[in-house]
From Swiss-Prot:
One of its GO terms (cellular component) is ribonucleoprotein complex. Binds together with bS18 to 16S ribosomal RNA. NCBIfam families: S6. This is Small ribosomal subunit protein bS6. It comes from Fusobacterium nucleatum subsp. nucleatum (strain ATCC 25586 / DSM 15643 / BCRC 10681 / CIP 101130 / JCM 8532 / KCTC 2640 / LMG 13131 / VPI 4355). Pfam families: Ribosomal_S6 (PF01250). Gene3D superfamilies: 3.30.70.60.
């Protein structure tokens, strides 16, 4: 299993309770695919470098985890259909 980081941006129109639920859903998605979550950091709402879907800000979340690389594609495909996740990136740690 390798270490990865995922940074995702939640739509700013999602309320606080909805954000917490979405963070829990993403963490549950990771663990259901065999990931071990090391930590989740909520960076809060920040200005975007460029507008995404006519939004100028987003709520940033960074999660560090370990997962088998073959399971990562399934996680990414499910993240693609989550409407409240505006963007995400998964990076392998050294």
């Amino acid at each position: 299993m390798r270490k990865y980081e995922i940074m995702y941006i939640i739509n700013p129109t999602v309320l606080e309770e909805g954000r917490e639920e979405l963070v829990n859903q993403v963490n549950a998605l990771l663990t259901s695919n065999g990931a071990t979550i090391a930590k989740t950091e909520k960076w809060g709402e920040r200005k975007l470098a460029y507008p995404i879907d006519k939004k100028k800000s987003g709520f940033y979340v960074l999660t560090t985890f370990e997962i088998d690389g073959t399971k990562l594609a399934e996680v990414e495909s499910k993240l693609n259909i989550m409407e409240s996740v505006m963007r995400y990136i998964v990076v392998k740690q050294d």
